[in-house]
């Protein structure tokens, strides 16, 4: 009788150890992928804000870099053009507003660059652990912005 109970306990403990190892690997990989994606987007924003140059090659490189780390992410690059308007309340004064623009390849000084990253779907290991044990991490969802300097 004791041998049977010990075998059951041994199988349960082995199963728990394997699951904990998979959970640890998933969390470690996810966190490393998130840090790498944030670093890529930060480098992209810094480069564009410093040089005010963006072409299709830069955009393709950003898409490829963000997709290379594991999580399937959607990258949106938004441009807000700086507009100086006369102030109707005080003649002679002006105020600034920002208007969304579809043209992301031509930049002026003072324009805002906004890069939004959202996760489209989980990785295979993450979906397995969620379906079996309910372990889940918050999806990748962040936005970085910068103002064009030159």
Q: Where are the predicted features?
A:
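Alpha-helical assembly-interface signal, strongest on the long, hydrophobic N-terminal helix that forms
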Residues: 2-63
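Short, conserved structural patches
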Residues: 53-150
